[in-house]
A protein has these predicted regions:
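Basic, amphipathic alpha-helical bundle interface domains used for macromolecular binding and assembly
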Residues: 102, 147-183
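Conserved ASCE/P-loop NTPase catalytic core
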Residues: 1-137, 141-144
Length: 183
């Protein structure tokens, strides 16, 4: 993957991560992957970045009844979940994501309020991010084989801010959308 393609992927994601759905990042834990993620964070995405545990519970995601607090004060107490606020969700070890969690995360992406960075550390060809998530992630970046010196510098933040401001004015002809989808 070339430097220009990496920079373009970062820019597209940083401009409107919720609209793009997310980013499938194939790379083992490495200085290259961390440099890419640091560069993404430096682009000041419009949503906060939250790291998920690979085995996160539904209560932690969606919130729910806090049993201990409810028993303590003898009336229902609800606690919020991570999904109560819009965010970019970083999913480590996405290749090991449980199908049920993948389905719930896919459903979340359909609301266009969240985005996911799926960190795919798959070592073998048969492993990978669950298809339910892949279908909703608009970008794929493969850092395998890149040397550390080829990782890019942060994108000019003023360009990202300007692109965000122009985004509502962009109109794409239906025929162009059809052609891109067919390609």
């Amino acid at each position: 993957m070339s430097h220009a393609v990496l920079k373009s992927a970062l820019a597209v994601f940083a401009i409107d991560p919720a609209a793009i759905g997310g980013l499938w990042l194939r790379a083992r834990a490495s200085p290259q992957r961390q440099a890419f993620l640091d560069c993404l964070a430096a682009c000041s995405p419009p949503l906060p970045i939250t790291r998920l545990a690979p085995n996160i519970s539904d209560d932690a995601l969606f919130g729910g009844l806090d049993a201990a607090a409810t028993l303590s004060i003898e009336r229902p107490v609800f606690r919020s979940g991570l999904l109560d606020r819009d965010a970019i969700l970083v999913l480590p070890m996405a290749e090991r994501c449980d199908p049920g969690l993948a389905a719930r995360l896919a459903q979340i992406l359909d609301n266009k309020r969240h985005s996911i960075i799926a960190l795919d550390e798959a070592a073998e060809e048969g492993e990978g991010v669950p298809p339910a998530l892949i279908d909703r992630l608009g970008l794929f970046v493969n850092l395998d084989g890149l040397r550390f010196k080829s990782i890019l510098e942060p994108i000019e933040i003023n360009a990202i801010v300007a692109a965000r401001a122009l985004l509502p004015k962009v109109r794409v002809p239906h025929m162009l959308v059809t052609e891109v989808v067919r390609a």
